[in-house]
A protein has these predicted regions:
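P-loop NTPase motor domains
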Residues: 168-172, 203-479
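Glycine-rich phosphate-binding loop of nucleotide-binding enzymes
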Residues: 102-189, 506
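Long, basic/Gly/Ser/Thr-rich N-terminal segments
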Residues: 1-91
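Conserved AAA+ ATPase "SRH/arginine-finger" region at the nucleotide-binding site
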Residues: 187-192, 202-206, 515-524
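Loop/turn-to-beta-strand initiation segments
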Residues: 158-162, 413-416, 452-456, 490-495
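Substrate-engagement module of ASCE P-loop NTPases
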Residues: 147-151, 439-445, 477-495
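Conserved ATP-driven motor cores of ASCE-family P-loop NTPases powering translocation/secretion/packaging/pilus
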Residues: 218, 475, 482-486, 490-544
Length: 544
């Protein structure tokens, strides 16, 4: 069938067709160029005179290796691939083995299944790419079903797979998993109207500076100190400690002293002091606070009066009152962080954080900081506040146990968790995925025994969440980039399912080792696929 080599150009080889027949059944079949090396090519076209193939790899030491290092010579023996070599391409046919994952049936080689080694596929970050309608969701569901439903020898009881489901379509695929011994499935939803005890919830007191920066859409690193101060204050104010009231007075006093020393005109100073005290006050410092002198008492408001010479004659009394309360050191107030607080509590802390940081004296600084407070207020009174409404305290370790076990049996671990994000907008879903992923990653990094609690985070419509965004500029890192670079050694693996790889974070995608590529059309996406590996050729791109 195969004659001499007529031409070799890049990865394409043209071979003389000795049969002088065109047989379409040979298209897609592999051939071997046998000499010192066993080069593998796939037949791409046939004419009466020539057969064209594309080199895709080599057989070395009983394994198939993608990529081309060598080229065939004129002395190469050319033949069709044999059965043993087909197995090296399509994978083991021992599907009952716990080491092998059934993927599907070969369209080229009748009677052969396609499989992958379980550990090789799921021990590295992976991506499943394909246009809308190409079968990505079906592919994911089928792969996971094959792990749990078609595996009778060794069930993966230690698996923890979290599916961030953009459309709520995976629930029916895994709802019967609990019928298998020692297996369990759990379902969370963002559907507030229908959820019972399975509504997506993140305790407000879990939110750290970077989480709040994302939630409040901070766009400048200078906004972070306000968030840090609010997180300090919320525990002090919520604790009901006697020092909490004292510290509130301290914050107000220091802010008012700054205004008094600003050098502004007395009328401006008076108006600003009254404005602050109207909104921020305590029983010790307010406009009606009595300032007593021998034989004469006045309210603080009266002490702010301006005489006919444009001066504030009683200002020294105001300074003495404020100085008496401006003595509290925040760092010396020790409060246990073992109680819950709400977004409403955090909002009150933001109020005092604004004046504590002195932003009232700068219009620009105030606008920048006040934006965060306004956004927090919008979340509290909007449709997203309910997802942070947890009124009881739990540690993050307790949260993880609660998240990954059945509510009726905390000894029963759930191997698949489906998170239905179909009822929230893309921006909020992106924030939730980042916060959850950070919680998972931090939990894994703090385990005494590294990688003892493996977690697979699978992101449907990953291009909505894993983007080249501004996280690095604002908070210093992107959680998905961090997980792709560091997560594997802690047992945290990311899986991206997307129709737009060109919109994914380049850092995250570059760390993926395994790819399943379905039908793709968009030129920018095809360029990304080709750049993923030197093993992807132009001919491979044409085939998808």
């Amino acid at each position: 069938m195969f004659g001499k080599i007529l031409d070799v150009h890049d990865y394409n080889v043209k071979i003389e067709n000795l049969t002088k027949r065109v047989e379409s059944s040979y298209l897609g079949v592999h051939i071997v160029f046998e000499e010192k090396f066993y080069l593998v090519g796939v037949i791409t076209s046939m004419t009466l005179d020539a057969i064209e193939c594309t080199l895709i790899g080599e057989f070395t030491n009983g394994k198939f290796n993608n990529g081309i290092i060598h080229k065939p010579s004129s002395s190469s023996l050319i033949r069709l691939i044999n059965k043993e070599e087909v197995l090296l391409l399509v994978g083991s046919q021992e599907l009952d083995s716990k080491d092998n994952l059934y993927i599907g049936k070969s369209l080229v080689y009748d009677g052969f299944n396609v499989s992958a080694r379980m550990n090789d596929l799921f021990s590295n970050h992976f991506a499943i790419l394909g246009n809308t309608g190409s079968g990505k969701s079906c592919c994911v569901a089928r792969l996971l079903q094959n792990i749990f439903y078609n595996n009778e020898t060794a069930m993966p009881t230690n698996a923890h797979i979290v599916l961030f489901d953009a459309f709520g379509e995976y629930n029916t695929a895994f709802e019967n998993l609990g019928q298998i011994p020692n297996m369990a499935f759990k379902y969370y939803t963002t559907d507030v109207k229908r959820a019972t005890n399975n509504l997506v919830k993140i305790p407000a007191y879990f939110l750290e500076v970077d989480d709040l920066a994302l939630l409040l859409n901070a766009n400048d690193p200078q906004q972070l100190p306000i968030i840090e101060k609010a997180l300090q204050l919320v525990y002090i104010f919520k604790s009901q400690d006697a020092k909490a009231l004292q510290y509130k007075s301290d914050i107000i006093a220091k802010s008012l002293l700054d205004i008094l020393s600003s050098g502004k005109q007395p009328t401006q100073v008076r108006d600003q002091l009254i404005a602050v005290l109207t909104n921020y006050n305590t029983p010790d410092i307010n406009l009606d606070t009595i300032i007593a002198q021998p034989g004469y008492s006045r309210t603080l408001r009266q002490c702010l009066n301006i005489d006919n010479q444009g001066k504030m004659p009683a200002v020294s009394l105001v300074v003495d009152l404020l100085s008496a309360h401006a003595k509290t050191d925040l760092d010396k107030i020790e409060v246990e962080h073992n109680f819950a607080y709400s977004l409403e509590d955090l909002y009150q802390a933001f109020e005092f954080a604004l004046i504590s940081e002195g932003v009232l004296s700068s219009e620009k600084a105030f606008d920048m900081a006040n934006t965060l407070k306004v956004r927090l207020h919008s979340i509290i009174n909007g449709e997203h506040g309910v997802y942070f409404d947890v009124d009881h305290f739990m540690t993050k370790e307790e949260f993880m146990i609660d998240f990954f076990t059945l509510p009726e049996n905390r000894q029963r671990t759930c191997q698949i968790i489906n998170m239905n994000f179909a009822y929230v907008d893309d921006r909020f879903a992106k924030i939730l995925t980042k916060i959850y992923s950070k919680i998972f990653f931090n939990f894994a990094t703090n385990l005494k025994r590294r990688a003892s609690f493996p977690i697979h985070i699978v992101l449907e419509e990953a291009h909505r969440y894993v983007q080249n965004d501004t996280d690095v500029e604002i908070i210093g890192y992107n959680i998905f980039d961090r997980i792709t670079k560091e997560g594997r050694k802690y047992g945290v693996i990311l899986g991206f399912i997307t129709q737009r790889p060109s919109e994914l974070s380049k850092t995250a995608l570059s760390q993926c080792s395994n790819f399943i590529v379905l039908r793709m059309y968009y030129p920018d996406d095809l360029i990304i696929i080709k750049s993923m590996s030197a093993k992807v050729t132009d001919e491979s791109i044409e085939r998808i």
